[in-house]
Amino acid sequence: DLLRYIGTMFEVLVFVYENYYAGDSCPEPAHLERKLNAVGFESEEIEDALVWLTGLNTAARGSKGFAGISQLAAPEPWLREPSLTSVRVYPVAERNHLGVECLGFISFLESAGVLPASMREVVIERAMAAPGSPVSLDDLKIIILMVYWSFGQEPDALVLDELCDDTSDRVAH
C-alpha cells in the first residue's frame, strides 16, 4: 500500500499519483495546492511536493527532448542517446545520496529493460532533489512511479507490482 508515507512530501506525491494518474487530469499548481489543503495536507508538505513536481516537469520535458534528438542533425556527442554498451558512472555525491540499495534497484530496472537511460537520468535528478541521505528504497520507488507518470507511461504490471510492494515483510530464504 502506497499510503505508508504519512506526514511527508512523499505522502503528497502518492496522493497526486493515485488521484491524477492520467497526467492531463492534474490541475494547475495553484488549484492543486487548494485541493491538497482541502484534503488536509500540511502547507510545508504541499509546498515541498509542488516544488519537487515542478522540477519533475522540467526534467521530464528536457529528457523527452534529449531522447528525441534527430541523429541527422549530428548533435554533440554528450547530447546523443547512450549506446547499449555504455555504462553510467555515479559521482560521489550521487552514490552517497542514493546509497547502495537504491543504486542496485536502479541497475535492476535498467537490466530488466524497463528503465531507459532518459528516464533513469530523471529518476536520479529527482532523487537528488529529495530529502533523506541516503534516499530510502521506498522513497525511490515513489520517485520512479512519478517519473513514469511524468512521461505519460504506465509501468507494466510486474514493474508496478515491484514498485508498490512493501519489502519490509519479506523473509530471506
Task: Say what each PLM segment does.
Residues 1-8:
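Short, Lys/Arg-enriched N-terminal segments with co-localized hydrophobic residues
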Residues 9-23:
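Positively charged, polyanion-binding regions of nucleic-acid-associated proteins
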Residues 12, 45-57, 109:
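Basic amphipathic alpha-helical segments that dock to polyanions
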Residues 14-18, 107-111, 141-150:
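Short, hydrophobic/amphipathic alpha-helical patches that form generic packing surfaces
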Residues 23-37:
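Short acidic, hydrophobic short linear motifs in intrinsically disordered regions
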Residues 52-64, 115-118:
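A short, conserved structural fragment
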Residues 68-119, 169-173:
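Short, amphipathic alpha-helical interaction segments positioned at domain boundaries
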Residues 125-126, 133, 137-173:
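Glycine-rich, aromatic-bearing surface loops/beta-hairpins
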